[in-house]
A protein has these predicted regions:
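Extended non-transmembrane interhelical loops and adjacent amphipathic helices
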Residues: 1-14, 92-139, 202-211, 215-245, ...
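Membrane-integrated ABC transporters
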Residues: 1-41, 64, 122-157, 241-244, ...
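An intracellular "coupling" helix at the cytosolic face of ABC transporter transmembrane type-1 domains
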Residues: 21-25, 128-141, 223-267, 313-316, ...
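Transmembrane helix-loop-helix hairpins at lipid-water interfaces of multipass membrane proteins
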Residues: 25-82, 152, 156, 163-189, ...
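Cytosolic ends of transmembrane helices, especially the final helix of ABC transmembrane type-1 domains
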Residues: 293-330
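ABC ATPase nucleotide-binding domain helical subdomain, centered on the C-loop/LSGGQ "ABC signature"
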Residues: 410-412, 445-491, 547, 585
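ABC-fold ATPase nucleotide-binding domain signature/coupling loops
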Residues: 472-504, 508-525, 529, 600
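C-terminal portion of ABC ATPase nucleotide-binding domains
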Residues: 539, 547, 555-602
Length: 602
């Protein structure tokens, strides 16, 4: 265990050092500034010692000592704001670079199935939290490392002054005492940090309960159901489950080791003080030497304390950075089909897309969601995929989007396996709205043009997409039109209803079509619209997108009757397919469910 901690500690320091170039040349200036700040306390010690010596003597030269001490104090006061400014600048630059790395790994590189696994969810929680908590960011770790320069310069200066007054033996003893104290303090911090990282799952549970119980999103339901006492009890229980083991471990880690290294430091300090007393008793020391020796000894003895400008920053900040590295490692474990950055661009389907004996099961689950599925999506036609909840409809969309790879079988475009194409370029060929589409807390315009950010300057395409989606009325009601932020959490912002949000999300997908996407996939696009509005939307939508390869997922059979072809999915397999008229004439599952739903909405 001890060897593992030592190895982990060395690796952490190396990782911090490798981040130094990210901040740029400002690190050199900050290092020089901390070097100077580290020398200033030594100047104060020398200045006061000279002043005391002159007072005890003739008094001549006293002002030189006083002047050196005063200048040292003033420079510390003057330079401290600059030190803080450089610390902030370095932290921001490094954190910005780390945030970009985290976003790249999670949003473009890491497999979705890997990101959904509990160990990586814990890592992502630590990384995100670390990037927003000032004292725990990777940038703070880099700035904290530079701040340690001042501390070690003070230590070196104190040791040198001790050696000049009492000789090399005293210098070695005081150095050993200081380093024992320092390594004892840092070792305890490292062991505690390791234990905290191992409790990530318990921490995630505790934070979830606390966040949910204190959030506005859950406030209405908590009040109406009167569940606040339960949330309080659950928060106490989960917090105790997370914190109590850490408190016990902290006492175990801190108490005995602190006692041990404190005794070592005390012994070293007593030994050096005895040397100082003996030298003074023999008359070997002047007043200058005695004053200098007393103050110089105290500098290393203060080295075993907690350094507020560096210790938690380097320890906790590196935990966040190590979480980012873990996510990047997961991103490097992509399946062979996803490692094709140099592969051909995704084509515009000419003949169509085919699912060939495709099976799929989510990682960690034994049951296949799709089982040897064969499906043709002819180019330029609209295909509706219907089925009850849990039939595998959304999973099919995820496979088509290359967010997941089939467990067995393959998906092809015009006869070429989808795995042969570059994933990103293929995804740009698709305009997709998922069931759980994102409600961006941005202005309305951004919520639409994020469907194709490269075309954000095309205002005409933006307006067409809004009109096609039936969102023009929504925009007209907003106080600032397209410039209105779609969240009441911001001044002047507005919350939208579920149906209004759905129209905005549809506009986003249709804007991607305007920008060149050739396959449009809508997963339950109108689930929050009433039946009449849904039918009207589909009638208009299928008319506007005629000639485009369109896939519409729905559990309402009555709303997709105008699609060129309807596919019924049940238990991960296709049970029926054909036009609405053909399926009704067949009198099978589709016809039965269509009539059942029609009676419910009659």
């Amino acid at each position: 265990m001890s060897q593992q901690l030592d190895t982990s500690r060395r690796h952490s320091w190396l990782r911090i050092i490798r981040l130094l170039p990210v901040a740029g040349p400002v690190t050199i200036v900050a290092a020089a500034l901390n070097l100077l700040i580290g020398l200033l306390p030594l100047g104060f010690v020398i200045g006061t010692s000279v002043a005391v010596d002159r007072v005890a003597g003739t008094g001549r030269g006293i002002w030189a000592g006083v002047g050196l001490a005063v200048v040292s104090l003033l420079l510390q006061a003057v330079l401290s704001p600059f030190q803080a400014a450089f610390t902030e600048l370095i932290s921001r630059r490094v954190d910005a670079a780390c945030a970009r790395r985290l976003m790249r790994a999670t949003l473009t590189e890491a497999p979705i199935d890997r990101l959904e696994q509990p160990d990586l969810l814990d890592r992502m929680g630590d990384a995100r939290r670390g990037l927003v908590e000032y004292s725990a960011t990777p940038g703070a770790a880099v700035a904290g490392l530079i701040a340690l320069i001042a501390r070690y310069v003070q230590l070196a200066g104190g040791v040198v002054l001790t050696g000049m007054v009492l000789g090399p033996v005293a210098a070695l003893v005081i150095t050993a005492a200081a380093l024992v104290a320092r390594f004892g303090e840092r070792g305890a911090q490292t062991r505690y940090s390791v234990l905290r990282s191992r409790s990530a799952a318990a921490r995630r549970k505790a934070y979830y309960v606390l966040d949910t119980g204190s959030s506005t999103a859950a406030a209405k339901e908590i009040r109406m159901l009167g569940t606040l006492p339960w949330w309080r009890q659950r928060a106490d229980r989960d917090s105790d489950s997370y914190l109590r083991p850490l408190w016990r471990a902290r006492r175990r880690i801190r108490l005995a080791p602190f006692t041990a290294y404190s005794l070592v430091v005390l012994a070293g300090a007593l030994a050096v003080l005895i040397m100082l007393r003996d030298a003074a008793g023999r008359g070997d020391l002047s007043v200058l030497g005695l004053s200098l020796g007393l103050q110089a000894i105290l500098i290393p003895l203060r080295f075993g304390v907690y350094f507020p400008e560096a210790d938690s920053q380097t320890q906790d900040g590196m935990r966040a950075y190590e979480s980012i590295l873990a996510i990047e490692r997961a991103a490097g474990q992509r399946s062979p089909d996803r490692r094709r950055p140099g592969g051909p661009a995704g084509p515009v389907p000419v003949r169509g897309i085919a699912f060939e004996k495709v099976s799929f099961s989510y990682p960690g689950r034994g049951r296949n969601v799709l089982r040897e599925l064969d499906l043709e999506l002819p180019a330029g036609t609209s295909t509706a995929i219907v089925g009850l909840n849990g039939a595998g409809k959304t999973t099919l969309v995820k496979l088509l989007s290359k967010l997941y790879e089939p467990t067995a079988g393959r998906i092809s475009v015009d006869g070429t396996g989808l795995g042969e194409f570059d994933a990103r370029s293929w995804q740009r060929r698709l305009a997709v709205i998922y069931q759980d589409y994102v409600r961006y807390e941005l202005d309305a315009a951004a919520n639409v043009w994020l469907g194709a950010p490269g075309q954000m300057a095309d205002s005409e395409a933006l307006q067409r997409a809004i009109e096609w989606a039936g969102a023009a009325e929504v925009i007209a009601t907003l106080p600032e039109g397209l410039a209105t932020v779609l969240s009441s959490r911001y001044s002047g912002g507005v919350d939208l209803s579920g149906g209004q949000w759905q129209r905005i999300a549809l506009a986003r997908a249709l804007f991607a079509v305007q920008a060149g996407a050739s396959v449009l996939v809508l997963d339950e696009p109108t689930a929050q619209l009433d039946v009449r509005a849904e039918v009207a939307f589909f009638d208009r939508f299928l008319e506007l997108t005629r000639g485009l390869t369109t896939v519409v997922i729905s559990h309402r059979f009555s709303t997709v009757r105008r699609a060129d072809r309807i596919v019924v999915l049940d238990g991960g397999r296709i049970t029926e397919q054909g036009s609405h008229e053909e399926l009704m004439a067949a009198g099978g599952q589709y016809a039965g469910l269509f009539e059942l739903q029609a009676r419910r909405f009659a």
